Design a protein with these regions (language model features):
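A contiguous pocket-lining binding segment that forms or flanks enzyme active sites
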Residues: 120-175
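Phosphate-binding/switch region of NTP-binding enzymes
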Residues: 159-226, 233
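Structural alpha-beta junctions
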Residues: 72-76, 97, 147-151
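Long, charge-dense
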Residues: 78-134, 138-141
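Signal for well-folded cores of large energy- and translation-related assemblies
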Residues: 41-42, 71, 91, 119, ...
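Hydrophobic/aromatic beta-strand patches that form the interior of the parallel beta-sheet core
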Residues: 52, 78, 101-103, 153, ...
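Detector for small/aliphatic-rich hydrophobic stretches
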Residues: 1-79, 226-233
Length: 233
């Protein structure tokens, strides 16, 4: 496999597709998520063949928490050019290191080709492109994602970097609207738990906005669901 920070060639990724691509049964329409996230979703997990957008302060932490259940269950994950993705933090959140590959962001001219190869290979592909994704690349990747039953996750962190709008709306959009830390006393102690408010909307039966509050412990692992609004009943 590729070491953290090593650039993978498209040909190598294509070879991985032949070796590791799992069989997807027709009944397996979703990838599992922690129970706390279910009120946000129209189905019992992340719909296969979809593109998911996660934005706002805490977007990377929520992405890790979203992927952890599927990763522990055997799904393979590729992280492509996501500077906010911490290797140790992802492992603490529950993402399985042995089924995760980190890839440097490819050159713009090769970006679509490399991402397509990863979609062919992995169940989950996490991206944070620094360039404007072309309409043709967006359409091809959407079609490939649907065909292969993968899930592409576009992370958009409030870190000052310029973000470009995708030509095609995401099937599911998660937004972190508030974030609060606890654990500090009167000038001493350490930051422990983090409370996040996450809303979701989109297509494929997710047109009605839903909202939950969750707590992540100091390691970044999902600790509890605090409340939900507009979720499934």
């Amino acid at each position: 496999m590729f070491e953290h920070g090593e650039m993978a060639e498209a040909s190598q990724l294509a070879a991985l597709a032949q070796r590791f691509r799992p069989a997807v049964l027709a009944a397996e329409q979703t990838l599992p998520v922690a129970e706390a996230f279910l009120p946000l979703l129209p189905l019992d997990g992340l719909p296969r063949g979809s593109r998911v957008s996660v934005s706002g302060a805490g977007a990377t932490s929520i992405t890790m928490a979203l992927l952890a259940e599927a990763s522990r269950g055997g799904s393979w994950t590729a992280i492509v050019g996501v500077p906010s993705w911490g290797w140790a933090a992802s492992v603490r959140s529950g993402v399985a290191a042995q089924r995760t590959v980190v890839v440097d962001e490819p050159p713009v001219s090769q970006w679509g080709q490399v991402i397509a190869a990863l979609v062919d290979t992995f169940d989950l592909v996490v991206v944070d492109p620094t360039h404007q994704v072309t309409a043709s690349d967006a359409r091809r990747l959407a079609a490939r994602t649907r065909e292969r039953g993968s899930v592409m996750v576009d992370v958009r962190v409030d870190d000052g970097r310029r973000r470009f709008r995708w030509p095609i709306d995401a099937d599911l959009s998660f937004s972190v609207s508030t974030s609060a830390w606890s654990g500090l006393g009167d000038g001493f102690g350490r930051l422990d738990d983090r409370e996040l408010t996450v809303s979701a909307s989109g297509r494929r039966g997710a047109d009605r906005q839903r909202r939950i509050q969750v707590r992540l412990d100091g390691s970044g692992r999902l600790a509890a669901a605090l409340a939900n609004s507009g979720g499934r009943t």
